[in-house]
Amino acid sequence: MSTEFPMRIGAEVALPALQGWNAAAGRDAIEKRYRFDNFNAAFGFMARVAMFAEKMDHHPEWRNVYNRVDVTLTTHDAGGVTELDVRMAQFMDEAAGRLGATGLPARADQPRT
């Protein structure tokens, strides 16, 4: 990755290009919850995304509980959402779709059980 930081575009600009993603509460970030058939599929998704993240040198904030993966994307160096986050979100949606996941918006009013 170059030494130049990506330009911040903000969640409000990024979200129209993405399906099922929401603005995170209290910060310039986007988030989504994926639900898979089982833990193996969820972990397989995370492994695939981890390899892509390493290539991009851009890493998600995420949490896995059984068949769910909750994801938050932001570019810390830029102080908010950038094109890197949009690219990562699009890759995640494609990878999740190949594994039969359903994407559920990760919202503060949804229980994270």
Swiss-Prot record:
Concerning CDD domains, the annotation shows: PCD_DCoH_subfamily_b
State the Gene Ontology BP annotations.
tetrahydrobiopterin biosynthetic process
Which EC number(s) are documented for this chain?
Answer: 4.2.1.96
Q: Which reaction does it catalyse?
A: (4aS,6R)-4a-hydroxy-L-erythro-5,6,7,8-tetrahydrobiopterin = (6R)-L-erythro-6,7-dihydrobiopterin + H2O
Q: Which InterPro entries match?
A: PCD_sf, Pterin_deHydtase
The molecular function terms in GO held by this entry are:
4-alpha-hydroxytetrahydrobiopterin dehydratase activity
Q: What enzyme class is recorded for this protein? A: lyase
Q: Is DNA damage one of the keywords?
A: no
Taxonomy, superkingdom: Bacteria
Which UniProt key words apply to this protein? Answer: Lyase
Say yes or no: keyword Lyase present.
yes
Classification via PANTHER family: PTERIN-4-ALPHA-CARBINOLAMINE DEHYDRATASE
Q: What family is it from?
A: Belongs to the pterin-4-alpha-carbinolamine dehydratase family.
- Name of this chain's protein: Putative pterin-4-alpha-carbinolamine dehydratase
Q: Which organism is it from?
A: Bordetella pertussis (strain Tohama I / ATCC BAA-589 / NCTC 13251)
